[in-house]
Amino acid sequence: MNKELTPEQIKEQKVYLEWGLTQKEYEYICDKLLGRLPNYTETGLFSVMWSEHCSYKKSKPVLKLFPNKNERVLQGPGEGAGIVDIGDNQAVVFKAESHNHPSAVEPYEGAATGVGGILRDIFSMGARPIASLDSLHFGEIDNARTKYLINEVVAGIGGYGNCMGIPTVAGEITFDDCYAGNPLVNAMSVGILDQSHIQKGQAKGIGNAVMYVGAKTGRDGIHGATFASADFADDKETQRSAVQVGDPFMEKLLMEACIELTNNHQDWLVGIQDMGAAGIVSSSCEMSSKANSGMELNLDMVPQREEGMSAYEIMLSESQERMLLCVKKGHENDVKKLFEDYNLEAVVIGRVTEGHDYILHHKGEVVTNIPVSTLTDDVLEEPSEERVPQRILDNKNKDTWVPQLSSAKETLEALLQQPTIASKKMFTETYDSQVRTSTVVGPGSDAGVIRIRGTKKALAMTTDGNGRFIYLNPEVGGKIAVLEAATNIISSGALPLAITDCLNYGDPNDPEIYWELHQSINGMAEACRTLDTPVISGNVSLYNENNGEAIYPTAMIGMVGLIKDVYRTVPSFVQNTGDKLYLVGKTGNDFNGSELQKLLNNKITGDLNDFDLEKVNSYLKNLLVTMEQGLVSSSHDLSEGGLGVSLAEMVFGTDKGIKVSLDMKKELLFSETPGRLVVSVSKDNVAAFEEIMGEDITEIGEVQVDHQLDITLTDDNFVAEVSELEKLWEEAIPCLMKSKD
């Protein structure tokens, strides 16, 4: 920790560079914004508020490409979370966040506090969190370090979420070498509220109180936002102090107190915001900026759990379980009493002021006096260079890779043991998916489904991201990411409403990485417009590199859908013997980036085939109509491993089997053409189903009594015992996790 250097020493020693500011930014702050040298505390404030994590200075120009409005959207990007109207004066609130860098350094706390932070975003909007999801990407399970990271991250997510009493109902876990040194830990939370309870993160009304509530402030997490905006080095031990430590029991109390305040005492409250990245400085500045007001804080009043904390440390701390409130003058004691009933501190630390200045007092001195806008609105945005990676240019000229297989059965057996495809039960069982007793469908299905109490409705939710596809073709891969999420939602019988995202990429200063970001957002934005799923919230996590090696560009899409009648929820597993099986969508030679390509070649190469998104959207809409009419018994989307893996998964955990005859060669059984599903339909509903779906379906077989997978292809056929396939699928990951390296 640097001692309190003078402004001149900061300039001379270039300390600001260590804190993440560039030379150009520092000079701009001195010469254009302040007309003087910033002091130690002010330099710290600029360094975190101008970090990519807080300012989006690199990504903002391309994030503007996303659609973020339609008739259902009540709150888009810019607040703690997005909000969508679901009828009956209710709304769903959701958001996703990344905690990648902290989880690589201190995986348990990194993952746990990622969950805690996203939950605070939800209840800061006035909503009660009803479900959590995650999207986790690790290196291959072939070394002790990766196994340690996996176990600790899963334990951290489960430990925090279970203590909070919020079910973890869905998610994904994938494995690729590129994530070995920089795992991705993306957390998503979903909440429900009455529309009359919606809150804003704003501090307006001259003389109104700024109140600090929750846990005391310590030295944990200082410069966490800067840490999240930089590349990794080998020596991660030195970065542990930037990782926060969570207390879920404190957060549970904080959540209940905040919900009581927002639901029952709105007349006391002006605004509320989570203290997340960059702690007090970020929450207070953002609340002032949104209200176009000033703020004056006395840092001596901030509850502190460590002695001798400087203004710099107090402002930059990312201690968990804290919120900032703007309370109407005269109601300070009311709020104090409410939080005391939950054994929580609530302290007035400042006031909303006239004008636009941000003033901080500490130990009798003014340690900061700058315009709010310099921290929030005047960030120096520089256009980024873009360059098409050579691998993309090379791939354009290559022939489509089509594998040569000797045995469909042996290939299926091998694919079911690929870690990305294999059962994740040993991890998901760590999570409580049934707490609150509203879970209709939990982990292991296409989407998690939560009943909305007091109504017939339910919400379906999913997280999906495939970095391999974006790596091979960012624009097409971006479209596939959104479509995969929508397919999962529709497969559950739900209408897709909107998305949140976590955009996990490498160093944006690399022109090739920035090109990947830009092109993939183009693809995602096109898909969002076509599917009418606006982006209502999200998160950008850049600098995901380890010693100069970037991860695959990985866009995680979190999507929520509405089921009008919970009794029309469609399961992912076959239900009735004799039901007809249909393949929805057409199958092509889509093997590049697939699990099959990785299995056979141990690497992914080539380009992706583009596809007709309008056509896919048209038949997905028709499929949803059939589901809402109760014509579909079960449905499962086709993703990793293609049709072969999906057919097997549909009978796992059941006592039934499947018999199909396919007009395709064995290789196509494992193609990963996007936008496809397998559905089962009872014989009574076949005529109505076929009339609605028309030419977009192919009858392929039926559900049978025998507990077997019986597949006939044009050049191969096999019968496999479901119990044997399921054993391979279930034991693959436990076996890898136990193996000696």
UniProtKB/Swiss-Prot annotation:
What enzyme class is recorded for this protein? ligase
Query: Where does this protein chiefly localize?
Result: cytoplasm
Q: Does the keyword Iron-sulfur apply?
A: no
* Record-annotated active site: 53, 99
Reactions it catalyzes: N(2)-formyl-N(1)-(5-phospho-beta-D-ribosyl)glycinamide + L-glutamine + ATP + H2O = 2-formamido-N(1)-(5-O-phospho-beta-D-ribosyl)acetamidine + L-glutamate + ADP + phosphate + H(+)
Compartments where located: Cytoplasm
UniProt binding sites for substrate: 98-101, 120, 244, 318-320, 541
Q: Which domain of life is it from?
A: Bacteria
Keywords assigned: ATP-binding, Cytoplasm, Ligase, Magnesium, Metal-binding, Nucleotide-binding, Purine biosynthesis
GO CC terms: cytoplasm
Q: What is its EC number?
A: 6.3.5.3
- Pathway membership of this protein? Purine metabolism; IMP biosynthesis via de novo pathway; 5-amino-1-(5-phospho-D-ribosyl)imidazole from N(2)-formyl-N(1)-(5-phospho-D-ribosyl)glycinamide: step 1/2
Positions binding ATP in this chain are 56, 95, 501, 538
Alphabetically, which GO biological process terms does the record hold?
'de novo' IMP biosynthetic process
Summarize where Mg(2+) 2 binds, as residue positions. 121, 274
> Does the keyword Nucleotide-binding belong to this entry?
yes
Question: Which GO molecular-function terms appear in the entry?
Answer: ATP binding; magnesium ion binding; phosphoribosylformylglycinamidine synthase activity
Kindly give the Gene3D superfamilies that the UniProt entry links to this protein: PurM-like C-terminal domain, PurM-like, N-terminal domain
Q: Which residues bind Mg(2+) 1?
A: 97, 539
Role, per record: Part of the phosphoribosylformylglycinamidine synthase complex involved in the purines biosynthetic pathway. Catalyzes the ATP-dependent conversion of formylglycinamide ribonucleotide (FGAR) and glutamine to yield formylglycinamidine ribonucleotide (FGAM) and glutamate. The FGAM synthase complex is composed of three subunits. PurQ produces an ammonia molecule by converting glutamine to glutamate. PurL transfers the ammonia molecule to FGAR to form FGAM in an ATP-dependent manner.
The entry's family comment says: Belongs to the FGAMS family.
PANTHER family according to UniProt: PHOSPHORIBOSYLFORMYLGLYCINAMIDINE SYNTHASE SUBUNIT PURL (PTHR43555:SF1)
Assembly notes? Monomer. Part of the FGAM synthase complex composed of 1 PurL, 1 PurQ and 2 PurS subunits.
Q: What is this protein called?
A: Phosphoribosylformylglycinamidine synthase subunit PurL
Organism of derivation: Ligilactobacillus salivarius (strain UCC118) (Lactobacillus salivarius)
